[in-house]
Regions:
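Metallo-beta-lactamase
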Residues: 2, 7-105, 111-130, 135-137, ...
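Short hydrophobic/aromatic beta-strand or adjacent loop that forms the aromatic wall/cage
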Residues: 107-109, 186, 211-215
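Divalent metal-coordination and catalytic microenvironments
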Residues: 112, 142, 196, 230, ...
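Active-site-proximal loop/helix segments of hydrolase catalytic cores
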Residues: 124-125, 202-265
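Active-site environment of divalent metal-dependent phosphoester hydrolases
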Residues: 127-128, 144-148, 170-172, 189, ...
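Short, conserved loop/helix-junction motifs that constitute active-site signature segments
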Residues: 132-133, 153-160, 240-243, 261-266
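Binuclear metal-ion centers of metallo-dependent hydrolases, dominated by the metallo-beta-lactamase
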Residues: 175-194, 210, 263-316
Length: 316
């Protein structure tokens, strides 16, 4: 299949679901769900996205974050379109059962809607603060700038809405009164209809990366959702207590042994994020096409039913 540029843009913005990938959670037939794309189309899109994002350097992305000017770069236009799409669909979508609606915004940032709640995980976007009036709470896995937005966190605090993070203070916004997750000790709490278990995982094997990331294991009725941030080590810390997740949101790079990780978690399905993080240089935190395909292959061999979360995708 050879997609034209016009067909490519149409495919990422409005592709109808073609087949259910998940066991235990069916894809919404009206959703542009990454989990429901054919492998052939996903493969084409990976190549196209890789090509389009390579032209955006961290410096260009940084200027866009300051002034909002996309400067004609397709990837930055796509980032704006993705945000508009997610905001519109989050307002319009009604969730009736336990299966939440989950959208990919950018990087490891997601919006989740349940019957009673709307919340974010690692939301990072130039306009993230404009979602605050809609959200009930927000989760942040760790204090790297590609996983949280300062203006968004300030706005959540000013709106007196819960911001759950692994750090109570940070040099970028000391005044934020976030809920601190204590040390490496797991914590379990409930916000509205979402029960949340936090546990520390290692971002890297080096000293700075030990216990650096807080993972979130969530119960939404009978649905199990897992977000592990930038977990980079598949050791005994990486484990679930509430059963195999219906959906695992993960970053398949850093130093993570994908095969070992999937054997430990055994998700019913998963979505790869953090693949085209424009603040990183290509191959230095920004995944290459080779890394993405290798991760997908390793996850598939481990029975993980992997899919790529493109910006703006509705995953569930």
């Amino acid at each position: 299949m050879d997609l034209s540029r016009r067909d490519f843009i149409t495919a990422i913005g409005g592709l109808a679901a073609t087949a259910a990938l998940a066991e235990g959670a069916d894809c919404d037939p009206s959703a542009s769900a990454s989990a429901c794309r054919s492998e052939e189309l996903q493969s084409e899109l990976i190549t196209k996205w890789n090509c389009e994002t390579e032209s955006v350097s961290p410096q260009v992305y940084g200027r866009y974050m300051l002034d909002g000017d996309t400067r004609g770069f397709w990837a930055l236009d796509a980032l704006e379109r993705a945000f508009e799409k997610v905001m519109r669909e989050a307002k319009e979508t009604t969730v009736a059962g336990d299966v939440p609606a989950v959208w990919s915004v950018y990087n490891m940032g997601y919006i989740v809607k349940t019957r009673e709640s709307l919340f974010s995980i690692d939301l990072k976007h130039r306009r993230a603060h404009s979602l605050v009036p809609l959200l009930d709470f927000a989760l942040v896995t760790h204090k790297h700038g590609d996983h949280y937005d300062v203006n968004f966190c300030k706005a959540m605090d000013e709106a007196d809405k819960p911001l759950v993070s692994s750090f109570a203070e940070n040099a970028a916004f000391d005044e934020i009164k976030a809920k601190a997750v204590a040390g490496g000790k797991p914590d379990v709490f409930k916000i509205r209809d979402v029960e949340i278990r936090t546990f520390r995982v290692d971002h890297a094997k080096e000293a700075w990366g030990i216990d650096f990331t807080t993972a979130f294991e969530m119960k939404i009725g009978k649905f199990r959702l897992l977000h592990t941030g930038d977990c980079g080590v598949a050791n005994d810390k990486l484990r679930v207590e509430w059963g195999h997740p219906d959906l695992w949101l993960l970053f398949p790079m850093t130093s993570l042994d994908v095969t070992d990780a999937f054997k430990r978690i055994r998700p019913k399905r998963c979505a790869f994020g953090h693949l085209w993080e424009l603040g990183h240089a290509v191959g230095k935190g920004r995944a290459t096409e080779w890394h993405i395909r290798r991760g997908l292959d390793m996850a598939a061999r481990a029975g993980g039913k992997p899919a790529v979360a493109f910006w703006g995708d509705r995953i569930c």
